[in-house]
Amino acid sequence: MAGHHHEHEQERDHEQEHEHDSLQRPTTGSERTRSISFSKLLTRSWKRNASSSNNMSVSSVNLYSDPENSRESDHNNSGSEGQSSRFSKLKSMFQSGNSSKNASAHNSSQSSLEGDSASSSSKLRYVKPMTSVANASPASPPLSPTIPETDVLQTPKMVHIDQHEHEREHSNCGSPIMLSSSSFSPTVARTGTGRRRSPSTPIMPSQNSNNSSSTSAIRPNNYRHHSGSQGFSSNNPFRERAGTVRSSNPYFAYQGLPTHAMSSHDLDEGFQPYANGSGIHFLSTPTSKTNSLTNTKNLSNLSLNEIKENEEVQEFNNEDFFFHDIPKDLSLKDTLNGSPSRGSSKSPTITQTFPSIIVGFDNEYEEDNNNDKHDEKEEQQTTTDNKTRNLSPTKQNGKATHPRIKIPLRRAASEPNGLQLASATSPTSSSARKTSGSSNINDKIPGQSVPPPNSFFPQEPSPKISDFPEPRRSRRLRTKSFSNKFQDIMVGPQSFEKIRLLGQGDVGKVFLVREKKTNRVYALKVLSKDEMIKRNKIKRVLTEQEILATSNHPFIVTLYHSFQSEDYLYLCMEYCMGGEFFRALQTRKTKCICEDDARFYASEVTAALEYLHLLGFIYRDLKPENILLHQSGHIMLSDFDLSIQAKDSKVPVVKGSAQSTLVDTKICSDGFRTNSFVGTEEYIAPEVIRGNGHTAAVDWWTLGILIYEMLFGFTPFKGDNTNETFTNILKNEVSFPNNNEISRTCKDLIKKLLTKNESKRLGCKMGAADVKKHPFFKKVQWSLLRNQEPPLIPVLSEDGYDFAKLSSNKKRQTSQDSHKHLDEQEKNMFEERVEYDDEVSEDDPFHDFNSMSLMEQDNNSMIYGNTNSYGKIAYTPNSNRSRSNSHRTFFKR
């Protein structure tokens, strides 16, 4: 037997030397490192037999050993260790062959005992043979005060063998060593020496001993170490299982046993002092001056599976986490309504797909016992935090909590049993449990009744969709594609105050107005219904409203309100302080700008046209008069009365590689042609004059005319009259003045845009993508156009140009009576009553014009100031804009 014993000792020495290199040094509670998850070390068969509990396992291991005991221990063990190791090496030299045979025979017998679960798991290591406590093999000193030697996990099939050996050991040893119930300084038998360790010295394993347990932790009386090698008597198989778990992993020697590895019987005995009224504190620390690791552990690092991810913890009290003032007459065992200790230790079946987010106490449940395929998934969700279990509830804010407990807010893998503890003495929580809806997970779990978190923690009720009133929309508004952006009209003509006239046309006027309620400035376009009926422009205003309401682009004006009265239509739009871009060109001496500035404005116009084409709209009226300057200096397209929407527009196609993605905008209006003769005569495309119909390519023709006018100050085909202008457009080729300051790429772009054959014109194939690929726009950052510095900034100034006076020259004021009539007419415009959509009859020609307000208004609208000279604009150069061609700045031209 002695030879056989030393043969196994030799093999275990080699194995321990190999395992020692792979062991990780346990960290203190303040270090933030990842620790080993207990659920990852358990096999499936062990996991199915583990039971969940509300019990708390406290491990009080002291890292600072007693110097006297450690020196004496080293002295006693040094000689025996050397003698044993020399004898083992000498023995192996002569009996190497016999040792191999015995080792293989022992491994085969051990494998037969462990069964399939041990053979299928790669995480199980060699299990030490069970020996008697009376074994007098010498114990070696510990490797380090903080590095306990890990033992191996035993499968559930080995539990009954462990119990049999354990009972035989106790029968041979006589009376076991028991802990005093009056002291929390445990005394643990030390094999081979009969010496007792002091509470300040951590119990470390013996490297060369055959004891089945390698780690022992100092625990209170209620938490005895159930390892067979320590000589504790136990007739409870569940307690023996918990002892095997404690002895199998060094992690739990410091952190305590997880609740899902403990049985309900441990919980019952743990609560016994309180049930008997003995007055012994359940979670009192050992009578040692040195704090244990569990007391100095940083609670802010706790997370799922004890992985310290710096998860924040909200603490409601600043006192010690453990409570010490629990009433003696309170039986925590009686308050655990939902504890597994009341019934079977079998884990409940959780059918919830994802872990619940629980506020307050936490506990862990295991997966269904028969559902093996979800074991590995549930291992990631199993938690090992036991510090918030078994709390004595008191009233706090009308809910059940303990006055000296720091309640963390953290995740839990399932609905906690600790919540039942808090709700056991709270009438509000019990009533909330009764009124819980059928959608609760408890309805799907037989025998489980877990209240929602808000039943015992006061929380603000979550807002429901029904709490927010749905915006009012008329039946006609709900049928429009832009109905999600607007609601029924919130303003009227009386809500605005006229500041001055900005411009006028054949069917209406544009006023600068101030909203009385918000003091914001807008541009209000007022159209006469009578004039529109006479000129047959009803469809035009409906198209303009649809484009303005549908568009959401930085280079297209924003529509805030649109409504109608008995005589007028109103379009309340964003006020562009810079006025018409045509006016800005007219303020220049040569009526033109340099090539770099023209490239900037042309690129923004191209981006706006691309957006309109994506929506299926053809602008058809691009000219400097319809381009407005925002207060930031960027352009804004307006006046969409001549625009038209292509019928049966197709979805745009994205082409190109990842580095150069292009959007085919021509397909949005592909196949659509219109014969309308619209546009300004100098900007009309040749196909419009011919009357054969036109497509979206007319917008690229007008872009070429616009770039030409920005560079040279006049249009390329202008004649003395309309007929001569049309003749030049149809027959003459574009020519450039003798000006070498215009680059070749710029001239090439203009020529390709002004190609008379629309099928060969630039942009006829892929729309805006063809234009943006031209070398003229090579350095343009299309995605950052809105953030680029514009060439000039409009500023309100008394010395600026008064555009209202310029436009007044077009008025026909033949007499003073007509002037009074105009004033009276403008006054009536702001006194009309709004007609809502439901009030307009179906036979009304303007019944499709919606009275609506934008739901989310832009706060960047200008605020009215009395000192501002609205209408008088001065243009200042932007000093932040870099110019490569400085000798031809905006003002020099």
UniProtKB/Swiss-Prot annotation:
Disruption phenotype: Simultaneous knockout of KIN82 leads to decreased phosphatidylcholine and glucosylceramide transport into the cell. Keywords: ATP-binding, Cell membrane, Cytoplasm, Kinase, Lipid transport, Membrane, Nucleotide-binding, Phosphoprotein, Serine/threonine-protein kinase, Transferase, Transport. ATP binds at residues 502-510, 525. One of its GO terms (biological process) is positive regulation of clathrin-dependent endocytosis. Residues 49-62, 96-122, 206-216, 422-439 have a biased composition (Low complexity). It is a peripheral membrane protein. SMART domains: S_TKc (SM00220). Residues 778-861 form the AGC-kinase C-terminal domain. Residues 1-23, 370-380 have a biased composition (Basic and acidic residues). It is an enzyme of class 2 (transferase). Present with 752 molecules/cell in log phase SD medium. Belongs to the protein kinase superfamily. Ser/Thr protein kinase family. KIN82 subfamily. This is Flippase kinase 1. It comes from Saccharomyces cerevisiae (strain ATCC 204508 / S288c).
